[in-house]
């Protein structure tokens, strides 16, 4: 957790004047919740609408039109340029995974449609959703120990504008690019050549991931 917070703080404040700063998720705050059995580190981020894989379902054939895709790709590339040139951060990382024990869960480290998020195109939407939840709350499950599990809202209605602004998210496995990194990254069939050859990887691994995603 400490390593992730350090990465997030670096991303949030490296250079807000860089245009790509607008296309990465920034840390707003962090705090610790003391529970009956453990402490929980909590992080606060901007509320976002939906991941790119869900966003593309809004278009015919689940395909983002080329004119919109070009705009989104420009944002993603500018966000990656900010991460690489200003923050010296590689999104693709191994975290605690090893070259031998690479699991499906480790793919969270890869740049993909799950962690490219679309911002709310209208700042009024979260307020409207909160109002709806207050008046007509979704299903809740109350446990015997008094805790309540709330059903998440993941449908915020039709888009009010066709093109959203992207945010690159999920930096829990990100690593610093100040030196060559090693280890097994990415899913087997999409793995970058340098990783296959165990030759170490750096910023180009993120660009490879973007190409695979597209």
What would you call each of these model-derived segments?
Residues 1-214:
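Intrinsically disordered, low-complexity regulatory segments of kinases
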């Amino acid at each position: 957790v400490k390593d992730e917070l350090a990465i997030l703080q670096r991303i949030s404040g490296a250079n807000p004047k860089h245009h790509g700063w607008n296309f990465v998720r920034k840390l707003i705050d962090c705090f610790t919740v003391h529970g009956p059995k453990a402490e929980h580190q909590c992080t606060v981020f901007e509320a976002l609408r939906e991941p790119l894989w869900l966003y593309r379902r809004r278009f015919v054939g689940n395909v983002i039109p080329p004119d919109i895709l070009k705009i989104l790709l420009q944002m993603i590339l500018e966000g990656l340029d900010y991460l690489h040139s200003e923050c010296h951060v590689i999104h693709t990382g191994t975290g605690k995974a090893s070259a031998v024990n690479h699991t499906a869960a480790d793919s969270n480290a890869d740049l993909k449609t799950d962690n490219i998020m679309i911002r709310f195109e209208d700042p009024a939407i979260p307020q409207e959703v909160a109002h709806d939840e207050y008046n007509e709350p979704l299903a809740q499950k109350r446990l015997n120990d008094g805790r309540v599990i709330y059903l998440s809202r993941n449908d915020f209605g039709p888009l009010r504008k066709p093109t959203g602004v992207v945010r690159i998210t999920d930096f829990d496995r990100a690593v610093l690019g100040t030196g060559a990194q090693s280890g097994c990254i990415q899913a087997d069939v999409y793995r970058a050549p340098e990783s296959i050859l165990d030759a170490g990887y750096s910023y180009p691994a993120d660009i490879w991931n973007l190409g695979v995603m597209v």
